[in-house]
Amino acid sequence: MIVHAVPDEPDFPGDIDRVKMESPRKFFSTINANVGEVMRHTDKNVASVAAREAMRLYRCGLLFDHDYDDNDSTKLYCSELVERAYLRAGVSLAEKRRHDFAVPGFHFEHVIMPSDIYESSQLKTISRF
């Protein structure tokens, strides 16, 4: 199973944006993704602790953080969820990488981008498709 946070992918009418858990088949469905990659931490113990923390966060029923505010632990965005799970294991995948950017009508500060986690030397690729 894959725990993740995503906006605008409701599972049923009236579903809210939240931390979700889905099968790999659904997560990597061509409806949701054109390409994919499975990566794991090089230390199995770290990966195990991070996985348990991701499950705990899922069970909390946290909403998706549309403000992309990593100072607010009551809501999580996608990369923040991954970083928080690994921090519980004592590891930062994003390290100090953060971004400030603006899009029309919004200004975001200190955001962890997916590429910040992807660039971690602590992860190894298991599969690409």
Locate the predicted segments by residue.
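Glycine-rich catalytic cores of cysteine/serine-nucleophile enzymes that process amide/ester linkages
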Residues: 1-40, 63-76
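Sec/Tat-exported extracytoplasmic proteins
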Residues: 6, 42-45, 54-62, 85-93, ...
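A broad, structure-centric signal for solvent-exposed, well-ordered loop/edge residues
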Residues: 9-12, 45-48, 100, 124
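Short hydrophobic/aromatic-rich motifs at helix boundaries and adjacent loops
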Residues: 22-26, 51-56
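Short, surface-exposed linear patches
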Residues: 24-26, 59-62, 87, 98-100
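Stable alpha-helical elements in mature extracytoplasmic
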Residues: 46, 50-54, 74, 78-81
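Activation targets extended, charge/polar-rich intrinsically disordered C-terminal tails
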Residues: 66-129
